Structures are given as structure tokens and as C-alpha cells.
Regions:
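Solvent-exposed, non-membrane alpha-helical residues enriched in polar/charged side chains
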Residues: 89-92, 96, 182, 241, ...
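C-terminal cap/loop subdomain of S1 sulfatases and analogous C-terminal strand-loop tails that border
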Residues: 112-118, 145, 156-161, 166-233, ...
């Protein structure tokens, strides 16, 4: 059998039911990761988002939120995560009751993260910080995937389908862009990708965004715009300093743009499969 179980939460609006809304102390949680003035060298839509529209007709400025208020938001978000965890537990318990636990591959991941006050912003959008695009993944299959192992290789969501098909003994269909993660799970240290590409067409913002993330650098390209983003992930893991205009990183920027263009071409929609000689 195959079951795709998709949960909307955790997601705004942050309104978990009881008792989940009261599980976490807002004042005991870490303050958001941010630095005064960090958005000065970012593209203009970052600063525009500081006074974003909420889920009413009222506009508000995120800069006016206190650490306690950010903690309240994070506590609600954590409560929603616990709500989902508990219900995933119900699924796992049902598999165990039916004797299917050891013969079922379970893969858990998400589609994106949440700003939660990091960099002074909330929700999501065309801001490709790690807190939004670095998605965790848990894979469980007793006897096949080593329990308790951790892997740090670069992968993408498009790799999920080829991975499941390989474990099921099925050849991926023609034109699939992803690569199976099975070699990584078997312990191959050389497996994985050099870069991960993130795409976001934010038409209501008038932006088409593509980001290339590697171990050392991250580049974000905005189609038709003169601005962009470049981060040194080793020197600036919090992504506070945008190096797009830094001439000393010009060669890195050019190299990353070329790698991004290569990837865009590689992932174009495939032509129909050729079945004849001419």
C-alpha cells in the first residue's frame, strides 16, 4: 500500500487547540535570530515585508513586536508541531497493531520552514533563508535503513520519488529530475548532490526567484532584477551579510550564477521520449 498523509499544520494562523496552545512557555524559548540593520543590504521586498498585512484588514509592523510576543508566536507554533507529532504517532501505532511496522518504509519531511521572527520577519515568502528552505527528513525502515544514523549530504524534494521507487523495485519514469537517496542511506559518503535548487514564483510580489545552495555558498537570483543575494555559509551561517555587491566575491558570484544556469537548463521539461530512429 501507499499512503500520502499531508498535514496543513504547523502553519499560520498559529491557533493550536487546547492543550497544545498552552504546552510551551513563551519566555523560555530562544529569541529570534536577527541583527539590527541586517536588511539594509537585502533586496527591497525584505524591508517591505516588515510591515506586512496579516489575516485581517489591519496592517502591523513586525519591528514593534516584543521578545515576549515573538515567544508567544513560537510557543503556538511548537504546540502545532506537537499536535502533528501526536497524530503521526497514532498512524505508527496502527501499523504496529496490524503487524506492518517492520515492512513499511516511513518518510517524514515538510515543504518549507517558518521565519518565526528570524531576521525580523514572519510567515514565509520570497526570502530563501535556511530557516525556510532547509527541510529536515526522517526515514525509517527496520532492517534496511540504519537506525539512529544522521546524514548531511545535499538532497532535494525531487529525490523522494526516485528513492521510494528504488526501494520498491520500480524504475523511475522517463524525465524524472531527482536522484535516489538510497546510496546515501547505505552509507556512501560520496553520494548526494553538489547543490540544491529552490524555486519560488511569487507573482503577487512580482518576483521569480531561484536559489542555489551548496556547502560553502548560497546564491539567490531574481529574474529581470539588478539585485540578488550571495552568502558565505561558513563565515556567515546566519545569513546576515549579503555579498552580492561585494567585489571581493565577484568570482564566487559568477561561478554560482553559471552553476545555477546549468541547473536550470538541466531541469527543463523533457522532450517526448524518442521511439524511432528519425
Amino acid at each position: 500500500f501507499f499512503a500520502y498523509c499531508s498535514f496543513v499544520d504547523p502553519h499560520h494562523p498559529f491557533d493550536p487547540p487546547k492543550p497544545y496552545g498552552d504546552m510551551y512557555d513563551p519566555d523560555a524559548l530562544d529569541a529570534p535570530c536577527r541583527m539590527e540593520g541586517e536588511l539594509i543590504d537585502k533586496p527591497p521586498h525584505f524591508r517591505k515585508a516588515l510591515a506586512a498585512r496579516g489575516f485581517s484588514n489591519e496592517r502591523y509592523d513586525y519591528r514593534k513586536l516584543t521578545d515576549h510576543q515573538w515567544g508567544q508566536i513560537k510557543a503556538a507554533y511548537y504546540g502545532m508541531i506537537t499536535l502533528i507529532d501526536d497524530n503521526i504517532g497514532r498512524i505508527l501505532h496502527a501499523l504496529k497493531e496490524k503487524g506492518m511496522e517492520k515492512d513499511t518504509l516511513i518518510l517524514f519531511t515538510n515543504d518549507h520552514g517558518e521565519l518565526l521572527g528570524d531576521h525580523g520577519l514572519l510567515f514565509k515568502g520570497p526570502f530563501h533563508y535556511d530557516c525556510l528552505i532547509k527541510a529536515p527528513m526522517i526515514i525509517k525502515w527496520p532492517g534496511v535503513v540504519p537506525q539512529g544514523s544522521r546524514y548531511s549530504q545535499v538532497t532535494e524534494h525531487v529525490d523522494i520519488m526516485p528513492t521510494l521507487l528504488e526501494y520498491a523495485g520500480v524504475r523511475p519514469p522517463y524525465g524524472v529530475q531527482g536522484c535516489s537517496m538510497a546510496p546515501i542511506l547505505r552509507g556512501d559518503k560520496g553520494a548526494g548532490k553538489e547543490y540544491a535548487m529552490t524555486e519560488f514564483n511569487c507573482y503577487d510580489w512580482g518576483l521569480s526567484v531561484k536559489t542555489l545552495t551548496g556547502r560553502d555558498y548560497k546564491l539567490t537570483y531574481y529574474a529581470g532584477e539588478g539585485f540578488g543575494e550571495l552568502y558565505d555559509r561558513n563565515q556567515d551561517p546566519e545569513e546576515f551579510r549579503n555579498l552580492w555587491e561585494d567585489e571581493s566575491y565577484g568570482a564566487v558570484k559568477a561561478y554560482m550564477i553559471k552553476k545555477l544556469m546549468d541547473r536550470i537548463i538541466e531541469t527543463e521539461d523533457p522532450l517526448p521520449l524518442r521511439i524511432g530512429k528519425y
